[in-house]
C-alpha cells in the first residue's frame, strides 16, 4: 500500500465496501501477542484468536458497535456481538475470577446496545496489578470459523480510539 492509498484509507469511510471490520482497543496499553498470555486457554487460542493488551488505564470499553452479550458476575470479562456479526470476548487479566469482583465495577448491562468507546467495566489497575496473576487482557474473536482474514496490529493503543485487529468475514 502506497502513501496515498494509506492516506486515502484514513480519510475515507468506505471500510464497508472493502469488507474490512476494525476492532478498536477496549482498553489503553501495549499490544502483546496472544501466544504470550500465561494461560493455555488463551495462548493456544482455544476460545478464539486475537491479541492481548498490557493495560495502563482504568476502564474497558466496547471495541465495536454492537450488543453486550454476557458480563461475568465478577465483572472481569464480557462478550459482545458486533453489528456485523463478529463475536468478541474481552477478559481482564489471568485468574482474575478468583478476586470475586474486587477491583471491578460494572457500568454497562447485558443486552445493552453500545457504540465503540462506551464504557462497559471500570477497574482499579494498581489493586489488580498487586493481586492478579497477570493483568494481560486477551481480546479474542470467538467465532473464528466465520472470519476469512485476521490482521493483528501492534504497539501502544488508546482506549476507544486505536484499532487492534482488522478482519474480513
Swiss-Prot record:
Kindly state one GO CC term assigned in the UniProt record: enzyme IIA-maltose transporter complex
User: One Pfam family of this protein, by short name?
Assistant: PTS_EIIA_1
List the InterPro entries.
Dup_hybrid_motif (IPR011055), PTS_EIIA_1_perm (IPR001127), PTS_EIIA_component (IPR050890)
* Example of a GO MF term: metal ion binding
Knockout consequences: In mutants defective in enzyme I and histidine-containing phosphate carrier protein (HPr), cells lacking this gene are able to grow on the non-PTS compounds such as glycerol, maltose, melibiose, mannose 6-phosphate, and alpha-glycerol phosphate.
- Note on how the cofactor is bound: Binds 1 zinc ion per glycerol kinase EIIA-Glc dimer. The zinc ion is important for dimerization.
Q: Which domain of life does this protein belong to?
A: Bacteria
Q: Where in the cell is it found?
A: Cytoplasm
What PROSITE patterns does the record point to? PTS_EIIA_TYPE_1, PTS_EIIA_TYPE_1_HIS
Which residues does the record give as Zn(2+) binding sites?
76, 91
**Where is this protein primarily located?**
cytoplasm
Q: What is known of its domains?
A: The EIIA domain is phosphorylated by phospho-HPr on a histidyl residue. Then, it transfers the phosphoryl group to the EIIB domain.
Q: How does it assemble?
A: Heterodimer with glycerol kinase (glpk).
Q: What name does UniProt use for this protein?
A: PTS system glucose-specific EIIA component
* Organism, scientific name: Escherichia coli (strain K12)
Amino acid at each position: 500500500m502506497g502513501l496515498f492509498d494509506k492516506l486515502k484509507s484514513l480519510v475515507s469511510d468506505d471500510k464497508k465496501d472493502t469488507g474490512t471490520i476494525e476492532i478498536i482497543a477496549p482498553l489503553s496499553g501495549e499490544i502483546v501477542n496472544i501466544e504470550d498470555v500465561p494461560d493455555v486457554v488463551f495462548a493456544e487460542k482455544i476460545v478464539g484468536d486475537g491479541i492481548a493488551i498490557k493495560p495502563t488505564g482504568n476502564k474497558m470499553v466496547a471495541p465495536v458497535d454492537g450488543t453486550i452479550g454476557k458480563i461475568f458476575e465478577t465483572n472481569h470479562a464480557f462478550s459482545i456481538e458486533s453489528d456485523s456479526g463478529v463475536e468478541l470476548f474481552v477478559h481482564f487479566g489471568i485468574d482474575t475470577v478468583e478476586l470475586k469482583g474486587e477491583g471491578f465495577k460494572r457500568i454497562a448491562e447485558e443486552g445493552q446496545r453500545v457504540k465503540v468507546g462506551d464504557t462497559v467495566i471500570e477497574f482499579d489497575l494498581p489493586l489488580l496489578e498487586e493481586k492478579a496473576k497477570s493483568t494481560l487482557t486477551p481480546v479474542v474473536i470467538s467465532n473464528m470459523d466465520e472470519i476469512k482474514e485476521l490482521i493483528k496490529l501492534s504497539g501502544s493503543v488508546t482506549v476507544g480510539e486505536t484499532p487492534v485487529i482488522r478482519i474480513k468475514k
